[in-house]
């Protein structure tokens, strides 16, 4: 049921924090690599709410809705109304995919750029793992430490 609505999921390990230096209070840019799909990611995280350290492992998933039946999100939060995908995760952000790019070469790479209210994510890797995403798509990012 929930696995049908998840468009991407993998386990990541934090390699670096703020690789270009600290830019903002309460926000850390996380550089991480995935275990299974060999993806690379930069992700801005509100570390006052969800602290991360180098070496931490976490599951990251992306889905277009939090509703377990796959129905579109209404945009309204109704606490305790029903079980959602968010119940299985610790840190959730909602944003918009604003850029998709592909690079050709020996090993082709695709890149997704998503903005979560100004917190940015770059997800880079094999185009086969992220080809089903669409420009201007609204997404939920869900994280849980392992």
From Swiss-Prot:
A Pfam family the protein falls into: RNA_pol_Rpb8
Q: Which UniProt keywords apply?
A: Nucleus
A single Gene Ontology CC term? RNA polymerase IV complex
Main location, first listed in the record: nucleus
The record's section on InterPro entries has: NA-bd_OB-fold, RPABC3
SMART domains linked: RPOL8c
- Which Gene Ontology BP annotations are present? DNA-templated transcription
Q: Which family does it belong to?
A: Belongs to the eukaryotic RPB8 RNA polymerase subunit family.
Report quaternary structure and partners: Component of the RNA polymerase II, IV and V complexes. Associates with the mediator complex.
Role of this protein: DNA-dependent RNA polymerase catalyzes the transcription of DNA into RNA using the four ribonucleoside triphosphates as substrates. Component of RNA polymerase II which synthesizes mRNA precursors and many functional non-coding RNAs. Pol II is the central component of the basal RNA polymerase II transcription machinery. It is composed of mobile elements that move relative to each other.
Name under which the protein is recorded: DNA-directed RNA polymerases II, IV and V subunit 8B
Q: Which organism is it from?
A: Arabidopsis thaliana
């Amino acid at each position: 049921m929930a696995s049908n609505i998840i468009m991407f999921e993998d386990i990541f390990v934090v390699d670096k924090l703020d690789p270009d230096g600290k830019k903002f209070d309460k926000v850390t840019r996380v550089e991480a690599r995935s275990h299974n799909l060999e993806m690379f990611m930069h992700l801005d995280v509100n570390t006052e709410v969800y602290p991360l350290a180098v070496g931490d492992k976490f599951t990251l998933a992306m889905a277009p809705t939090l509703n377990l039946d796959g129905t579109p999100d209404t945009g309204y939060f109704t606490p305790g109304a029903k079980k959602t995908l968010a119940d299985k995760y610790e840190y959730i952000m909602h944003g918009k995919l604003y850029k998709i790019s592909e690079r050709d070469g020996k090993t082709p790479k695709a890149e997704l750029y998503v903005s979560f209210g100004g917190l940015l994510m770059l997800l880079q890797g094999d185009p086969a793992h992220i080809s089903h995403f669409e420009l201007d798509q609204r997404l939920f990012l869900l994280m849980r430490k392992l």
